[in-house]
Amino acid sequence: MTSYDPTLFEGAAAHYRYGRPPYSPQLEAALAEELGLDGSGRLLDGGCGPGILTIRLAHLFEEAVGLDPDAAMLAEGRRVAAERGISNIRWVQAVAEDLPEAAPGPYRLATFGQSLHWTDEERVVETVYDMLERGGALALIVHTVEGRPEPPSPGPPRIPHAEIKALVEKYLGSTRRAGQGVSQVRTHRFEDVLVRTRFGAPRSIFVPGIPDLVRDSESVLSGYFSMSSSAPHLYGERVEDFAGEVRELLAARSPEGLFWDWPGDTEVVLAVRS
């Protein structure tokens, strides 16, 4: 496997599914309609983590492949898939730069759910182009609030992200960390990458997010522990001190322990192989 920092998401796998806001419940139907998915062909989910997308989309294909370099993330994906009786997923431990050898095509759809930025983007996109069937698609899936109407609050207060981030900085410093290094700030859009490849200019579809998503305090804390920049191992022996301060803050902001989370709509950036 190409070089990978195994501490990048160390300790995060158990928090990921519980702590990350879900994509639109209409995502599967939207992809099926846009791409004519009918249960045939194969799916490649790159940087799949614990299989959030892999598991949701597997029923739309004959076979799904979840690819990720983190063994704990893949183990979590296997566990959940087994619990749900999903048997058509193959899990591959590799980075996207190991494609195509790590998981040879062809594929009808390749997805990256908020994960392409961890890769050598242009190189990986060009590789994926060759792995797709003719007419196959690459879908980059993200939450977005940009230009999207905000729904009315369902009642509970918003998650106090600014205050929690201040606590993260108190414990970890002002430099945003990631594994053994620092997190790189992304300054470009996916469209900027795709237009330089054989895919050309992509198009975006927007699928309605969950307007009344309410999360409890432990889910909010797990959301931070699921991030590379705030993974449990970064806090060392002070991890419980950090967790305690976050819980105190959340209890002060919402005695009921409930918070409104609006991650936005689900944006799918689609590019099709000609």
Model-derived regions: residue spans:
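Class I SAM-dependent methyltransferase SAM/SAH-binding core
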Residues: 42, 50-98
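A short acidic, Gly/Pro-enriched loop at the edge of an enzyme's catalytic core
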Residues: 101-109
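A short beta-strand submotif of the Rossmann-like class I SAM-dependent methyltransferase core
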Residues: 109-112, 121
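A short, conserved alpha-helix within the catalytic core of class I
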Residues: 118-128
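Conserved Class I S-adenosyl-L-methionine
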Residues: 185-274
